[in-house]
Swiss-Prot record:
ATP binds at K8, T168, D169, T211, G212, G213, M214, A215, T216, K217. Its EC number is 2.7.2.11. Residues 276-354 form the PUA domain. GO terms for cellular component: cytosol. The gene is proB. GO terms for molecular function: ATP binding; glutamate 5-kinase activity; RNA binding. SMART domains: PUA. Belongs to the glutamate 5-kinase family. This is Glutamate 5-kinase. It catalyses: L-glutamate + ATP = L-glutamyl 5-phosphate + ADP.
Length: 369
């Protein structure tokens, strides 16, 4: 049965060592694996890092640039060379590819988000393998994915993938970094991310040439599994592992997808949008939303954090400040401060106009517990 596969390869797997040289043998093997999957009927997306690393190599830089403008310039140099390499390798196997460069703003804007979806579908119909990367040259700090693990998870959610493979420089997730801690225990299967968080130690940074560590991969797994995508962390230096895993072998760390998934629009609200503020709720409102599936009313709001406009995304928090949901607000932050704790029947009198009865309607609300 044909499946949709999203494969993310990081800079640590693309590079052959600390000097940042490309691991061409590994990349060529990955290309062969992806072409094999494509030819048997699977739909394949490759999310590839490496523009900054390749650009730095071409420019003779010995360290990854730190300033945004310099990173963007180096990425502009590297992205073309990266795609040329992929095009040369895929062309040997007569497999057409496409470059898709996106920014976080493309995922935040609903129309742009849908346009990206339609582009993927058209490429799949044409038998093309899309190669995705963040458009580093035009991205701004406030609207960056930050790492391609997150980008790959959002892409997997967007195209409703069956599998997300996060290729890294270790064979699976461990209780601690096995390169440092010899007592680290391998983790083969994850059902509860909450339980996992209590048992492992993860770093916030990856290799010198990458931006993502294991923590970002776990966050990516959360996004993907919430969308019903089985996620696997495995060794990027052995691309044939993908075929073995698809064949049923127990390699890597498998994150089980959630059995009940939300619809595509709510996935967009929950994970693609960037919350502009927070609404703190009383216990009654928390229960009504998480158990009863109700809309958020003004009466249940105890605190408003941040400045935002109507239809912006916000976090909904319990009395301790822990996030319980996300949603699109019907009023701006100033208006909500004026009506918080009030009955819905009083909103028009307080605001001076008749608006929505709800602060966040349940159709625009997603529980994230």
């Amino acid at each position: 049965m044909a499946q949709t596969l999203v494969v993310k390869i990081g800079t640590s797997s693309l590079a052959g060592g600390k000097e940042g040289n490309l691991a061409l043998a590994t990349i060529a093997q990955l290309v062969e694996v992806l072409c094999h999957c494509q030819r048997r009927g699977d739909r394949v997306v490759l999310v590839s890092s490496g523009a900054v690393g390749v650009g730095a190599m071409r420019l003779g830089l010995t360290e990854r640039p730190q300033q945004l403008a310099q990173k963007q310039a180096v990425a502009a140099v590297g992205q073309g060379h990266l795609m040329r390499m992929y095009d040369d390798l895929f062309a040997v196997l007569r497999q057409p590819i496409a470059q898709i460069l996106v920014t976080r703003q493309n995922f935040v804007d609903r129309q742009s988000y849908l346009n990206i979806y339609n582009t993927f579908q058209a490429l799949f119909e044409l038998g093309v393998i899309p190669i995705v990367n963040e458009n580093d040259t035009v991205a701004v700090d406030e609207l960056k994915f930050g790492d391609n693990d997150t980008l790959s998870a959002l892409v997997a959610s967007l195209v409703e993938a069956d599998w997300l493979f996060l290729l890294t420089d270790v064979d699976r997730l461990y209780s601690a970094d096995p390169r440092i801690d010899k007592t680290a225990v391998p983790i083969e299967r994850v059902v509860s991310l909450a339980e996992l968080a209590q048992t492992i130690q993860v770093g916030s940074a990856g290799s010198p040439w990458g931006t993502g560590g294991m923590a970002t991969k776990i966050r990516a797994a959360e996004i993907a599994t919430e969308a019903g995508v089985r996620t696997v962390i495995t060794d990027g230096r052995s691309p044939t592992n993908l075929l073995k895993i698809l064949g049923g072998e127990a390699l890597g760390t498998h994150f089980e997808p959630r059995p009940k998934t939300i619809n595509a629009r709510k996935r967009w609200i929950a994970r693609a949008l960037i919350p502009k503020g927070e609404l703190w709720l009383d216990e009654g409102a928390v229960k009504a939303i998480t158990v009863g599936g109700k809309s958020l009313l003004a009466a249940g709001i105890t605190r408003v954090e941040g400045e935002f406009q109507a239809q912006d995304a916000v976090k909904l928090c319990d009395p301790t400040g822990a996030e319980i949901a996300r949603g699109l607000v019907n009023y701006n932050s100033e208006e909500i401060r004026r009506v918080q704790g009030q009955q819905s029947t009083e909103l028009a009198n307080i605001l001076g106009y008749a608006g929505a009865d709800t602060i966040v309607h349940r159709d625009n609300l997603v529980v994230t517990l």
